[in-house]
Amino acid sequence: MQGNLLKVLGVLAIVATLVCFIFAALGMIGAVKVGDSCYMRYASDGQGGADSIIGTITLNANANYVNTAKMLSDGTTLLVPDPTRYGEWLNTQVLVENSQPVNLQVVGQVSLCLAYIPKDNLQRTGAGSNLDDNGQMIPIPRINDANNPPVSLIMDAKNNEWRNIAELYANDRVLVSVSPNFANTDATVKDAFKGAEVTQDCSENKTTYNPICGKYSVYSGEYVNACELKEKYWNCEVTWRCPTWHEQIGCDWGALGCVASCKKIPECTTKCMAWVNITRPAPENYLDDGSFTFSWSDNTGKLFIDYSALQCSYNANIPPVDKCPDRVRDRRIKDKDYIGGVHCTSGICSDGDFQKNRRFWYTADGKGGKGPTGLIYQMNDAGSVSQALPSKLEFAKFVADTDQPPDYKGKDGKYLYKVIYNIPFNSNIAKSYLQYRLWSPTSQDSSKNTGGYVLNIKQTKCYRENGNSFNDTFDDRGRVQYIIVKPSENPNTSGKTYSPQGISVDSEGKYSFNANEAGYIWMKILNDPGNNLRDYKDSEGSYKVHFSTSLKVGSFTIKVMNPLLQLFKTKVQGAATSIFKNMVCYKANDSSSCTNFFTYIKAILILYVMTYGAMFLLGFAKINQKELVIRIAKIGVVSGLMNGNTFEFFNNYLFDAITNFSDSIIANMSGYSLFTSTNTISNPFMFLDAVMSKIFFSQTFIAQLLALLSLGLSGIIYFIITFIAVCIVIITALRAVAVYIMAFMATCILIGIAPLFISFLLFDFTRYLFDNWVRFTIRYMMEPVVMMAGIIVLTQLFTIYLDFVLGYSVCWKCALPIKIPFIGTILPIALLNVPIFCINWFAPWGMDYMSGMMGVNMQNIVALVIIAYGMYGYVEFSGRIVVKLTSAVGPSATEIGGKMSHDAGQKVLSSIGMDDKTRQGITGRAEARLKQRNKTLDQAEKNRKNTQKEGGEKTNEEPPKPETPK
């Protein structure tokens, strides 16, 4: 036995080594694709017996997972998405069975389309207003795009219309900012339509500015700047008299007065003073100190001064004429004190409070206020251009400094752009437009305005997060979909039509479902497939989809042992009962097809009684009372079993009791309930279910075993030892099954021919046949019991120590770093621990290749091998025990079962040239070659000695003798 075991161990060691190097080679070339998954030691409910797999995949928004190399102008290459692979499904590498539960959580943000400058925008309106000078649409960078500045749109103050800055879909994110008020410097802005930078002088002391300077004015013409006192300025006193007789005949009647039909003649004898207006062009020159600048306000009353209503005196804007009477009669003081000052009483006066309150300019910085002065916005579902102002104006405000993007500041700490709008578009409306305009009073002619602002925009369009979806111009955009496809299919190339299932996540992005069929889960994000997949191509971002699924490990008992044993036991029991029936012709309609063995037994029994009675009467046979009782009992038993109900008695009471005796005892020893709905024992090997199910059907076990290879050179040794121990247990289990099958078959056959051997009970010279029949029946009944008693205990120990050795969760990750050896002699020591690249492989949960390898308790591995070796040896040992117990010398089920398993193993090994016959042939040929080599060396040595003697050479040293092979 020991020699056979050593041979088996040698073969298993070679196979394990080959498997080790094969998997290592696969890892080196990266041919193993299992996904970024982890096989957990226990399921989420803390129970074992299940493959609990967690994993994470990256689901790209553009549904493109293939990169191609693109040559740049500088000679370098850049990996870019393959232009022909957008909108594809991604294999999650999660293999599920039908009705298997799957839990997932979607985390991340994506933008599923790209924003472009809309029509009728701040800078242009009309047909083609959304196209640049080359006829191309102008893309808007996304908010998280730190490599590209926002798109700048120039707002001219001469435009008094609502214009669009952004087309917004449901859940869009938009970031609108305003360029600063460029003070005493040049301003440079990139014109998005021309694709070139525009630079303008924005220094102070000017009355007109380009819109990019960040300031504007609605004033034009002139305004009253001071008041001047004019003496004798106008004819203030008028008297009326009748025309004289000579001036108009018949008008003056003297004391009687004027004739009513005559017009009186005015006479101005006195001229009065008046305060006249001194005007200046509007607006005043802009000053950087804010002297003529409005502060930010959301009250239009504080944003406009009606200079036309300010007059030094009433009707001061109407000059006098040298006539009597004057054109106006009222030139009283009106706003002189406010304009010129209270204390100024002569000359030109310009010291009033008005001088300090003059305002003409609106600036993008709001003069230190809450936002850009005069900038208003609104939402418009149609995006139409109009001049109508709503009843309530929304004035733009700066967002809090904490919400200002850091990259919007320059190196000097000043804002390059300052955000004024960052509100997500959360609306039930599929689409709307964000519009802006500069406030201007309706009384002013906007065509005479000067200056303007520059608004800048970044927009993340079709924004989705954590797997949520919304309806915009495309229904359900952003919903994560999945299909379950057979392992042999690729939905991207199969040409088949599938029915995707949508995932409706909760607020945390979680979702659970049961697989509706078996296969791999494929996923992608739903987007508009139209317009040549433009939205997919414009998409950006990705989701992290965290999977967790648990599937009960397939039962070795249910899948393998039950079908095998039930089929075998049914066939054997049927054959045994058929033998019994045919021997007694039980219920046989045609007696010609069988011979009733009981007929012969009856004849023998009659002959036995007649002969023995005659001998007793003639005195040839002496018998005492004891012998008489024994002989009568034998005759009674044999004759009692020779009636028509014999088969029913054996079949109903003895047959099942004897054949299932072993199963009942084994079941009680193992502690497992083996009774089915019919209260019959179907499988005595239930104690093997846990360990054999883990070995054959558990993905987690395979991953745990392969993870040993990630522990370095020691891990390879651990793998080989553990693999050999597992193989020994498998072989032992198969040998135990073979022994059980042979014992069961022998028991059934012995019971089937029971009528024959029971008849041997009558005569002393056939008594030994009956005794041996009983011994062998008991032996084959007890042999599986004794064998299983020890294997049950050893199997439980093996299961415990196997969990000690492989009791960890496993992840597919970087496990084997490749470093340059002796790098410390060439490069700085800082590079000693930096890997060049890393091979992904199964590795224990929590193991970091940078911090050293995780150790395994060698004691547990040694114990595992000892237990496996003990199980292998116990099979034959149990057979010897039964032989001693039953004293039944002859072929045992253990020997026959061992021969069966050995022959089966040799048949498998012969395919790879590792069977005993092939190895003996190899060994024999090697020995023959070795003998021939030694013979050749001996002959060469003799020839050398003979040559020396013939040449007469002498030497004091003897030539070395050839080493005798051992």
Swiss-Prot record:
Key word Kinase present:
no
Which InterPro entries is this protein grouped with?
Conjugal_tfr_TrbL/VirB6
Bilayer-spanning residue ranges: 601-621, 711-731, 743-763, 785-805, 822-842, 855-875
Task: Provide the leader sequence positions.
Answer: 1-24
Question: Where is composition skewed (Basic and acidic residues) in this entry?
Answer: 926-966
- Where found? Cell membrane
Q: Which domain of life is it from?
A: Bacteria
What broad class describes the main subcellular location of this protein?
A: membrane
Gene Ontology biological-process annotations: protein secretion by the type IV secretion system
Q: How does it sit in the membrane?
A: Multi-pass membrane protein
Q: Which Pfam families match?
A: TrbL (PF04610)
**Family assignment?**
Belongs to the TrbL/VirB6 family.
The name under which this protein is listed is Uncharacterized protein RC0144
